[in-house]
Amino acid sequence: MSKIKDDVKKQIEKRRTFAIISHPDAGKTTLTEKFLLYGGAINQAGSVKGKATSKHAVSDWMEIEKERGISVTSSVLQFNYGGYCINILDTPGHQDFSEDTYRTLMAADSAVMVIDASKGVEAQTRKLFKVCTMRHIPIFTFINKMDREAMDTFELLDDIENELGIATCPVNWPIGSGKEFRGVYDRATKSVELFSDTRKGTTQGEVQIVPIDDPSLNGLISEEQKAKLEEEIELQDGAGAELDQEMVSKGELSPVFFGSALTNFGVETFLKHFLKMTTSPLPRKSDKGEIDPMEEGEFSAFVFKIQANMNKAHRDRIAFMRICSGEFEAGMDVFHMQGGKKVRLSQPQQMMASERHMVDKAYGGDIIGVFDPGIFSIGDTLTTSSDKFSYEGIPTFAPEHFARVRQVDTMKRKQFIKGINQIAQEGAIQIFQEFNTGMEEIVVGVVGVLQFDVLKYRLENEYNVDIRLENLPYEYIRWIDNPQDFDLAKLSGTSDMKKVKDLKDRPLLLFVNEWSIRMTQERNDGLVLTEFAR
């Protein structure tokens, strides 16, 4: 381990790397775009929904995302604002892609949770919040869509605390909602921030700041709004939790902000507060203990995402890695721990969704993409340290839906095998082979059924292969942990059990129900089954 240089440390201290999570349609992608607008990364914000002639969201780059208006992959976006270098990881909102979201959260130091003001905490928010708590990262809440009819502010805060089990502390307070949404009250400065027209959110707009006790405020908001604001603030100040930065850092208390991403109201206010309150890159667990980016001078990173064919013209494969320590330089040689050899990281690039630009240098906290000739896997560690180590692995979700997949045109077998293998290596699907059949019979497992649609779409559009999917009745998957103790051909199970193997030749069993699992274990004394591959 080598000591960090002062100039590298200063660069790392500027980094803020966070993920944005939400239930579908809470406004996550719109909020991401507005951050880019304020950071000067785009001149005019597009909207996810709208007329066919409208721009598509900057972070939705895959064709199927543009067609459906949902994010099905995690986009990586970088921009500068207020002296900070910001890396945003925009995650899929749809529950069928929760595995991709989990991997993305592994690369984040904090999370922004977007909640629809009219609906409160929704199903997918709960699931994603659980993943955040497993990582013990700070969680900041942006209550969105205040320009529409909203739940009572106290009800929203109670909903977050009761549903998610986390304390809340509103940093600001909304003034009205729906058509009467005028701005927010900043509790720290005791001033009101009033928002101007932003041309339906396509431009930044101006903010007028007025102290709460300034007489001029009476002409800017109604007497009723002012009286209600003063009453609610008095109640909150008397009964609410104080803003405890240590609790925030541990993920035990969530600072809450209100606004409207669509109209830009409250977005820049949130961004400014968030960047000051959130953390610079955090230490990471490895098999040699924690690696602290503020102390470790050697370069280290781990792969959290692999994506093929981001641009049809390139036909390449990019491995996205989170730099955890040190300084990256283009063309540098690093040791690939899982491959057991040195590799050169070529064509390093940073992304604005599908737009890419080459980078010469990057630092701890940054996300970069490098050309992958097919040697990297999700969770791999790369380092220049002579004291070699591996970062904690990224677990694989057990698939819950299965289908047999065949290509329609037998002459396109080569493209089919290449395509399905590449998509599997990205972690979007898991593929299994039946015993003694090679790749003739392929079974695909996914966490959510929408992933089958994405698989079909991508094979057709990126590899020019039409496929047929035959849904299978299996719901449970178990890897055999001790295959050396059994003759797998003679393994006795229920009639609806299926024997398959994964891409690493590890044997596993598919079951229709839990009864079949119990019966198989009873008939094969000593058989050890696990939900995850080891």
Language-model segment annotations:
Residues 1-534:
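Structural and coupling elements of P-loop NTPases
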